[in-house]
Amino acid sequence: MTNIGKTHPLLKIINSSFVDLPAPSSLSSWWNFGSLLGVCLGVQILTGLFLAMHYTSDTATAFNSVTHICRDVNYGWLLRYLHANGASMFFICLYLHVGRGLYYGSYTYSETWNIGILLLFAVMATAFMGYVLPWGQMSFWGATVITNLLSAIPYIGTELVQWIWGGFSVDKATLTRFFAFHFLLPFIVAALVMVHLLFLHETGSNNPTGIPSDSDMIPFHPYYTIKDILGFLIMLTALSTLVLFSPDLLGDPDNYIPANPLNTPPHIKPEWYFLFAYAILRSIPNKLGGVLALVMSILILAIVPILHMSKQRSMMFRPLSQCLFWLLVAILFTLTWIGGQPVEHPYIIIGQTASILYFLIILIFMPATSLMENYLLKW
């Protein structure tokens, strides 16, 4: 009898994607983050769905509805903190996943890479809009500051901001539409994930060496399914520990104060996972220049495949490029720290130096080092 998994139209797709998929035998734990992101998305959609059953997107009741969820709904506090900290886990996995792609040269699969960048923007937009929904002080002022950046766009900027706000300030209309889009976007993200996987399965996975592994493949199941499940357990343990022991560790205390348009918090800042981009934005004195730098800090990933000058795909055998890569990681940590600090000396100059180095390393130092390594190969 023929295996139904190989004949049924739907099961056939699942079988070829998760069971009989040929995978390189040398994949390290850095290849776990794709599946971990899938779990994160699942957790966020499920917890978000149950939160949406009790949340009201009205400026008069939004803050109280979140309080009601935490106090009166059965395990509402758990849902709320799983959702809030699940977003942090999502971004940790996202940044590690992108870092893996940069280190091992996975960006040479340009379609998969570009869909990935699109996914990154979609998840960032979703997270930003989600942060506005509890309608605390940082929700309101964060929304005001970030949406106001669009006014830097020449000619249409002011009209565009008022169109997004649905009025002359962040108010009821803004909150309602942000809730609508925050609900919708994760499903668009899920669809994009399918496209991301479709393109990945066209080429097959990369591996740590960057060398084609067609002659050394193993079935995805049971080898990598077991490996992924171990990853799930580790991540869910970390998430549970964060949620149950210090749920507010990564949040902002100002968000426990209801939104007040007449009272500005002393330091307006986004969630920790946007701080590096926020630091780059603040390091440029010109508004339009800052906005362009902010967008380019992520969009620069799209030109990384063009800047790949090395004869080797992976950085595994390129110690000079490795040094630059880890310097880039250190700079991103520095920018994250600076983004959470007030705009005063010495933080301003540290942020500006780190921002310049961030772009210099990606645009100039890494390609130049790759060319030098190519030359050294001839020795």
Swiss-Prot record:
Gene Ontology CC entries for this record: mitochondrial inner membrane; respiratory chain complex III
A single BP term in Gene Ontology: mitochondrial electron transport, ubiquinol to cytochrome c
Chain residues that bind heme b b566: H97, H196
Transmembrane regions listed in the UniProt entry: 33-53, 77-98, 113-133, 178-198, 226-246, 288-308, 320-340, 347-367
Gene Ontology MF annotations: metal ion binding; ubiquinol-cytochrome-c reductase activity
SUPFAM superfamilies: a domain/subunit of cytochrome bc1 complex (Ubiquinol-cytochrome c reductase), Transmembrane di-heme cytochromes
Membrane topology: Multi-pass membrane protein
Keywords: Electron transport, Heme, Iron, Membrane, Metal-binding, Mitochondrion, Mitochondrion inner membrane, Respiratory chain, Transmembrane, Transmembrane helix, Transport, Ubiquinone
A Pfam family recorded for this sequence: Cytochrom_B_C
Family, similarity comment: Belongs to the cytochrome b family.
Oligomer and partners: The cytochrome bc1 complex contains 11 subunits: 3 respiratory subunits (MT-CYB, CYC1 and UQCRFS1), 2 core proteins (UQCRC1 and UQCRC2) and 6 low-molecular weight proteins (UQCRH/QCR6, UQCRB/QCR7, UQCRQ/QCR8, UQCR10/QCR9, UQCR11/QCR10 and a cleavage product of UQCRFS1). This cytochrome bc1 complex then forms a dimer.
Reported function: Component of the ubiquinol-cytochrome c reductase complex (complex III or cytochrome b-c1 complex) that is part of the mitochondrial respiratory chain. The b-c1 complex mediates electron transfer from ubiquinol to cytochrome c. Contributes to the generation of a proton gradient across the mitochondrial membrane that is then used for ATP synthesis.
Identification of the protein by name: Cytochrome b
Organism from which the protein derives: Ametrida centurio (Small leaf-nosed bat)
Gene: MT-CYB
